[in-house]
Amino acid sequence: ENETLLAKNQYIKGKNNFLRPPMITTYECKNILIEGVSFSNPPFWTIMPAFSENITITGITIENPGNSPNTDGIDPSSCRNVHISDCHITVGDDCIVIKSGRDEDGREAARPTENITITNCTMLEGHGGVVIGSEMSGDVKRISIANCVFEGTDIGIRIKTMRGRGGVVE
């Protein structure tokens, strides 16, 4: 049948279509190191660790076209102990997005994203430099951002919410 890969805002649950895949995804992994590599032109989010812990992402470059929708840079979701440092990120959406599940799925999993440090990163272009939410139904706790440069982003640091989604930022 006709199956189509769509941008997130075009996806309709239950229809015969699918979201485009992230470039790199980890799921329920521990002790992850992503270091010194470059990424460009992902079909969707670039790096998306989910339900993982002890993650270090350092010295990477992400360069995605400014007109490409849903091409976030780094999107930890329901992760613990994440250190992102010395990264250069230019994207068509948000540079770094802290997530913890969407709506009922996030509330049911009840896994917060916590203990996140973001240091010495350069974020050029994109909607937001560091964004918390809006997919944060499982809560977000203890985020530290230091010595980062936001140049050409619509906003540097943003907390994004959505009515009815739920979630707490501490």
Predicted regions, residues:
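Extracellular/periplasmic carbohydrate-active domains that bind, remodel
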Residues: 1-170
